[in-house]
Regions:
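Glycine-rich, phosphate-binding/catalytic loops in enzymes
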Residues: 26, 81-84
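Noncatalytic alpha-helical scaffolds and linker/capping helices
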Residues: 68-69
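Acidic, polar ligand-binding/catalytic clefts
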Residues: 78
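Metal-dependent polysaccharide deacetylase catalytic core of the NodB/CE4 family, i.e.
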Residues: 5-16, 60-63, 72-75, 83-170
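N-terminal pre-catalytic segment of deacetylase/amide-hydrolase enzymes
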Residues: 1-63
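Short, intrinsically disordered, charge-balanced linker/junction segments flanking boundaries
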Residues: 171-175
């Protein structure tokens, strides 16, 4: 397709949760997004091949689907559709809210993670605005999440999404 080595990425959060319009998408519109992606001849980038394929020239246009925060609405609304269609994605999980009202449980996360087209990513422990915390607080947050990921999944995810998309050089170097 081109010598461009990049991959387009689309991030989603909530599905069919009209109470949160800034982070919500209706499933009807989400399905339309997927249809447009397919009709535009994009391949869905499988996150399981992320490290080995990311910086290589692409034969076709590729797009990466990411889901932030592991809201329960992802599991009840989008997950059945993604699973049925085997659409690759990364689910970025903040460990602190897991199991709380409105969030997925570890059992649900493990179910999702058990599919070859799904990948669990690291999204910190508290989902704080990390740019406002000290380096020590940042390290504690990440290490707390790492321990929980090890306990619950048996590994620490190798893909990281910064909450709110902001970070410092220290944070980037630490991750």
């Amino acid at each position: 397709y081109s010598n461009d080595e990049g991959i387009l990425s689309i991030m989603y959060h909530r599905f069919n949760e009209n109470k949160y319009p800034s982070t919500n998408i209706k499933m009807e519109i989400f399905r339309e997004h997927i249809d447009i992606i397919r009709k535009s001849n994009f391949d869905f980038h499988n996150p399981n091949n992320f490290d080995e394929q990311f910086n290589k020239p692409k034969q076709k246009k590729e797009i990466l689907i990411t889901i932030d925060d592991a809201f329960e609405s992802f599991y009840t609304e989008a997950w059945p559709y993604l699973k049925e269609n085997k659409i690759p994605f990364i689910l970025f999980v903040s460990t602190e809210p897991v199991g709380k009202r409105g969030y997925m449980t570890w059992e649900q996360i493990k179910e999702v993670e058990g599919n070859e087209f799904a990948n669990i990513g690291h999204h910190s422990h508290t989902h704080e605005y990390l740019i406002d915390v000290s380096n020590e607080e940042f390290i504690l947050d990440i290490e707390t999440a790492n321990k929980i990921f090890l306990r619950e999944l048996g590994y620490i995810p190798n893909l990281f999404s910064y909450p709110f998309g902001e970070y410092s050089k220290f944070m980037k170097d630490y991750i």
